[in-house]
Regions:
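Metal-dependent de-N-acetylase/amidase catalytic core
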Residues: 1-10, 100, 104-287
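Active-site rim/loop-helix segments in enzyme catalytic domains that contact anionic ligands
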Residues: 1-121, 154, 233, 262, ...
Length: 287
């Protein structure tokens, strides 16, 4: 095992950095791993609960600062939310690409931009969205995953005398996370063919995940909603993984072992009832 990991996380929206693999990110940050978080857009075209709530009020009761907010002002607000999320999780570097929300299409310019980040950061682990479409998928999510995978192929196939840069082969594993509800349908746990092969127990840092989601005021995820999101999603994953709260991942390539894998967590495991570290976790008792 590497003593410390260098992890690159790439998501299309600020909210994804809080609702998807944030517990896993917090765990790795606590163990001293370097975390670079890339947010492709400011998320200005979806989950606009803050603006919708204001617009639903009678004109005389509306806050002009919100009701008349410009696109640039709204983007800046979303940017600050992402910055606070990164601070909560212990992210070392936050990178904004400034792409237009709802307009993430697979093209060579975007691939080149992500490839440049990979060359600079030199990660050994990459976390991004599952790059698979189905009829229910919001396309920014899988499109981002596809762009990241092509960028990884691009940096691995550079030749200095042809391209002016060296190839980078340092990424040891990619982990795909699952966007809420998109890979899950109403008739089964997961869409057929999509099955996680890695579960991370995030029970020890669930308060940090709640606190991160609590920053998403523009989306209405703050307050009690932050806890409800975690209970509904990560509590469900935990039920499947055999712990209080978990995050699921799927790897594009298998890991080969010299012998059957028996990590210390499994070898030393003795039965004990699940006990949360901080009692009833709500957004109101998180510092």
């Amino acid at each position: 095992n590497l003593e410390n990991h260098n992890i690159l996380v790439v998501y299309p929206h600020p909210a994804d950095s809080a609702t998807e693999a944030s517990g896993t990110v917090a765990l790795h940050a606590e163990r001293g791993d370097k975390i670079t978080s890339v947010v492709a857009t400011y998320g200005e075209r979806h989950h606009m609960q803050w603006l919708h709530d204001e617009e639903s009020k009678p004109a005389a009761e509306q806050d002009p600062a919100v009701a008349r907010m410009t696109l640039e002002e709204y983007r800046n607000f979303k940017k600050r939310e992402a910055e606070r999320i990164a601070e909560v999780l212990g992210v070392n570097e936050l990178v904004f690409l400034g792409w237009n929300d709802h307009e993430i299409y697979f093209n060579l310019d975007k691939v080149a931009e992500i490839a440049e980040v990979i060359r600079r950061v030199k990660p050994d682990i990459v976390i991004t969205h599952l790059p698979i479409h189905n009829g229910a998928v919001y396309n920014d999510h899988p499109n981002t995953g596809q762009i990241v995978m092509k960028a990884l192929e691009t940096v691995a196939n550079r030749v200095r005398q042809f391209d002016g840069v060296d190839a980078y082969h340092g990424v040891k594993q990619v982990f795909f996370s699952f966007a809420s509800g998109e890979e899950v349908n109403s008739n089964s746990v997961f869409t057929p063919g999509i099955v996680p092969d890695v579960w991370v127990d995030i029970s020890a840092v669930i308060d940090k995940k709640i606190h991160a989601i609590d920053q998403l005021v523009s989306q209405g995820y703050h307050g009690e909603t932050a806890r409800w999101v975690v209970e509904a999603r990560d509590g469900r994953w935990g039920m499947l993984a055999g712990c209080a709260y978990a995050e699921p991942f799927l790897r594009p390539t298998a890991i080969t072992y010299d012998t059957l894998p028996m990590p210390p967590r499994v070898v030393s495991k003795e039965y004990e009832p699940t006990v949360l570290h901080s009692g009833r976790t709500t957004a109101h008792n998180v510092p």
